[in-house]
A protein has these predicted regions:
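Bacterial N-terminal signal peptides that target proteins for export
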Residues: 1-10
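Bacterial N-terminal signal peptides
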Residues: 10-18
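Short glycine- and acidic-rich boundary segments immediately preceding or forming the N-terminal edge
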Residues: 23-69
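Loop/turn elements at helix/coil->beta-strand transitions in domains of secreted/extracellular proteins
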Residues: 57, 70, 82-85, 125-130, ...
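Active-site-proximal beta-strand/loop segments in catalytic clefts of secreted hydrolases
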Residues: 61-64, 77-78, 89-92, 132-137, ...
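Metallocarboxypeptidase
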Residues: 72, 178-348
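Short beta-strand-to-loop junctions in surface cap/lid or active-site-entrance loops
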Residues: 74-82
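Active-site/substrate-binding loop(s) of hydrolase catalytic cores
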Residues: 97-100, 105-242, 306
Length: 348
């Protein structure tokens, strides 16, 4: 009877899971690692943040999602009599979850340091900061729950078959804004970039339009992630800026962000993209052209040395990404204050 040496088998059983986890830790992890905010815990997370300084923060419901009537939450942070406002939207696309964590960490920093820290104190004296962790609670629910890794759109039944087809149904919320919408050729409803049946057809976008009409936004920043890696760690400006003063201001603020954020895995910093950008109904085009608001998009999450786009990293990298992007946002806010102060002085 042949004997079997069990030691190599035991060794393999112990080591292989470790090797697998180490490989995962350097790439994408799905289901998401434990420190990602999950949809079912978002409301409680927001309540905890407001509790830090309830006199300067309020949780708002600005609207509801198109298919499932889920609330779209916002945090309104700062003094109520502040004359200007800043908008940060952490997520338009369900799979792009890094911005949710970043936006909540930003809110926590603002409230934890106010009024002790000079930077936060001065900012919140003059600006209200509106933070919307996710504009797409439907897509966020699908991805954060582990149902599907790549879910870009909301859950509208776009093929009208009376059921949710996770991979194809939905509208790309960042192509549904009513500026340049008619120029977008993406009309196939099963496309991941489907722009919707008409401009602002989605209730999520209607909520943002209403908010924009009510507030005097001096800056709008939209956090995204590039699943393909083509746009990783780039900052995109509005289309058709035409070198105007407003465009130059937008570009200068974006440059501050880029200079403040090092790439995740490769050498160098984030880059402001200098080529032509999409003439579609996206958020930055809408705010820039409709309201004259400096607005730009930041693609969070880098490519590793193998060229793989990492938008669902492990906890350790997640924390690093969140920390440096919160610092970049704060640097942009400080630069905005400086520029606005100079503009006001020049008007006197």
């Amino acid at each position: 009877m042949q004997t079997i040496d069990v030691l190599p088998i035991i060794f393999g059983m112990l080591i292989l899971p470790c090797l697998f986890s180490c490989v995962q830790a350097k790439g994408n992890m799905y289901p998401l690692d434990t420190k990602y905010i999950k949809a079912e815990k978002l409301n409680a997370e927001l309540d905890q943040i407001v509790h830090i300084s309830p006199e300067f923060a309020e949780k708002r419901i600005i609207g509801f999602s198109s298919a499932e009537n889920l609330p779209v939450y916002a945090l309104q942070i700062g003094k109520k009599d502040a004359s200007k406002a800043i908008l940060v939207i952490g997520q338009h696309h369900g799979e792009e979850v890094l911005g949710v964590n970043i936006s909540l960490a930003l809110a926590e920093r603002l409230l934890s340091n106010y009024p002790k820290a000079e930077k936060e104190s001065h900012l919140l004296e003059h600006y209200q900061v509106w933070i919307i962790p996710t504009l797409n609670p439907e897509g966020f629910r699908i991805v954060s729950s582990g149902m599907l890794r790549n879910k870009r759109k909301n859950n509208r039944d776009t093929n009208n078959n009376q059921q949710l087809d996770l991979r194809t149904d939905g509208v790309d919320l960042n192509r549904n804004y009513p500026v340049f919408w008619e120029l977008d050729t993406e009309t196939e409803n099963n496309s991941p970039y489907y722009k919707g049946s008409e401009p602002s057809s989605e209730s999520e976008i209607k909520a943002i339009i209403t908010l924009a009409q009510q507030q005097n936004f001096a800056l709008a920043i939209f956090l995204h992630s590039s699943i393909s890696g083509v746009s990783s760690e780039k900052i995109f400006l509005p289309a058709k800026g035409n070198g105007s003063e407003l465009f130059q201001k937008t570009s200068s603020l974006a440059a501050v962000y880029a200079a403040s954020a090092k790439k995740d895995y490769l050498k160098g910093n984030y880059e402001v993209y200098n080529g032509s950008t999409s003439e579609v109904g996206n958020a930055r085009n809408y705010f820039f052209h409709r309201y004259g608001t400096p607005a730009f998009l930041v693609e969070i999450g880098g490519k590793n040395k193998r060229g793989q786009s990492i938008i669902h990293p492990s906890n350790a990298m997640l924390e690093k990404i969140v920390d440096k992007n919160v610092k970049a946002l704060m640097n942009v806010f400080a630069e905005l204050e400086t520029q606005d102060t100079k503009e006001n002085e020049n008007k006197l």
